[in-house]
């Protein structure tokens, strides 16, 4: 699984698409277009409802050979048998999360500063990390942007550790992120809110592949 994560370039965070009512079709479209990792990110879900939705995500991931990620909760990741658990700075320590999910689950960590990147790189328990937000984003209201300088630092410091740039990334500013040294990105609205999500995902995937 860690090898699959290392090969991943395009990581999508998306909600349950309750408003659109198209979750299975949406997942098939974007995973078929080149999304490598997909994470359900929707605050306030009861555990039972989150697991029900994750079943839909898992089925789509199996069809397309993609990785399923769970946000924040090691217990949900364990119950859903996800491939990936992503933790924030204020979530469970990585070592405790590992004791819950086991050795086969890939664990990632959010970082927002040079110091946090340094800590992630020096911790062998962190399988990958995310760097950002590159720009202010409504997904994380009130969080100041880390900016591209932290992305540039990660590009120099990460070595062989996989990492993703995140936060406000879209097709218009993707080249700036690539020029800063990122070769993997996490995307939210630029795919989920696109007029044609599959077309947007395909363009992200193609441009990331060209930069690899």
UniProtKB/Swiss-Prot annotation:
GO terms for cellular component: cytoplasm. Mg(2+) binds at residues 72, 91. GO terms for biological process: thiamine biosynthetic process; thiamine diphosphate biosynthetic process. 4-amino-2-methyl-5-(diphosphooxymethyl)pyrimidine binds at residues 39-43, 71, 110, 140. GO terms for molecular function: magnesium ion binding; thiamine-phosphate diphosphorylase activity. Pathway: Cofactor biosynthesis; thiamine diphosphate biosynthesis; thiamine phosphate from 4-amino-2-methyl-5-diphosphomethylpyrimidine and 4-methyl-5-(2-phosphoethyl)-thiazole: step 1/1. Its EC number is 2.5.1.3. It catalyses: 2-[(2R,5Z)-2-carboxy-4-methylthiazol-5(2H)-ylidene]ethyl phosphate + 4-amino-2-methyl-5-(diphosphooxymethyl)pyrimidine + 2 H(+) = thiamine phosphate + CO2 + diphosphate; 2-(2-carboxy-4-methylthiazol-5-yl)ethyl phosphate + 4-amino-2-methyl-5-(diphosphooxymethyl)pyrimidine + 2 H(+) = thiamine phosphate + CO2 + diphosphate; 4-methyl-5-(2-phosphooxyethyl)-thiazole + 4-amino-2-methyl-5-(diphosphooxymethyl)pyrimidine + H(+) = thiamine phosphate + diphosphate. Keywords: Magnesium, Metal-binding, Thiamine biosynthesis, Transferase. Pfam families: TMP-TENI (PF02581). Its cofactor is Mg(2+). It comes from the Bacteria. The keyword Zinc-finger does not apply. Binds 1 Mg(2+) ion per subunit. 2-[(2R,5Z)-2-carboxy-4-methylthiazol-5(2H)-ylidene]ethyl phosphate binds at residues 137-139, 168. Condenses 4-methyl-5-(beta-hydroxyethyl)thiazole monophosphate (THZ-P) and 2-methyl-4-amino-5-hydroxymethyl pyrimidine pyrophosphate (HMP-PP) to form thiamine monophosphate (TMP). Belongs to the thiamine-phosphate synthase family. HAMAP family: TMP_synthase. PANTHER family: THIAMINE-PHOSPHATE PYROPHOSPHORYLASE (PTHR20857), THIAMINE-PHOSPHATE SYNTHASE (PTHR20857:SF15). This is Thiamine-phosphate synthase. It comes from Acidothermus cellulolyticus (strain ATCC 43068 / DSM 8971 / 11B). The lineage of its organism: Bacteria, Bacillati, Actinomycetota, Actinomycetes, Acidothermales.
